[in-house]
């Protein structure tokens, strides 16, 4: 469903329907934020696990930072012209990487996306997502919400 709102926001943007684009973009972001929280409930779907694994491979702070940056690059900008070649649908990555990047695309600063990506990759990351207390109930609620 978020993909549908996103595609419509892109179409609205191309046709200069600013308010419609903003509305569809906000619906995209709202759904993605819910998905991010839901995925935080499972350790296999969290950026936190990937970053910790990379950082634990280093022995010095400089090594840890470099390993973290390399790990984040692999799942974001690695692949050159094949954008999002190794993309993952993980909690933390959705909230802290994909959503801000999408929002930046819809601003007049589209040419700054690569610069923003590099800054995100090379900056230390910390988890700020709180999982749902009851992920099953949250999933059912999300399904109901998207079927309206």
Residue ranges of model-derived segments:
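Catalytic domains of carbohydrate-active enzymes that cleave complex glycans
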Residues: 1-148
